[in-house]
Design a protein with these regions (language model features):
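N-terminal pre-domain/capping segments
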Residues: 1-111
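Active-site-proximal loop/short-helix segments
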Residues: 116-120
Length: 120
């Protein structure tokens, strides 16, 4: 069994600025965690790197830092919404962020991603 904990890369300050995920990775490594579950559920927030054309570079930087610290990503959680709600329908922007989250999952080296469709 691999003991792991969860890291949310998309934590924002009250002013909308983005928290430094490097510090979180270092913090978990110092606590002795070498396996992480990554949360992408807030990846559609306004300042998310997933809204940029450089989101893959961002994921590669995280992977590099994690590798330096001996951390592996076990799984991720992609953003979700209730696409079954006939009043809301499919949200193309959220669908793109889900797709980008899956691309980042691959870059991070996680073999699984979790989604909760229809439960939001």
């Amino acid at each position: 069994m691999k003991l792991s904990t969860t890291i949310n890369f998309f934590t924002y300050e009250d002013d909308g600025s983005y928290s430094a995920y490097y510090y979180d990775l270092e913090h978990y490594a110092k606590l002795g965690f070498s396996h992480l579950d990554s949360i992408f559920c807030s990846a559609d927030a306004p300042f998310s790197p997933l809204w940029t054309n450089h989101y893959e570079d961002w994921a590669h930087k995280i992977r590099k830092k994690a590798d330096e610290l001996g951390i592996t990503f076990v799984q991720t959680h992609v953003p979700f919404y209730n696409f079954c709600d006939l009043k809301k329908g499919v949200n193309e922007n959220t669908e793109e962020i889900v797709r980008r989250s899956i691309v980042c999952t691959n870059i991070l080296g996680a073999h699984w991603t979790v989604s909760h469709p229809g439960t939001a």
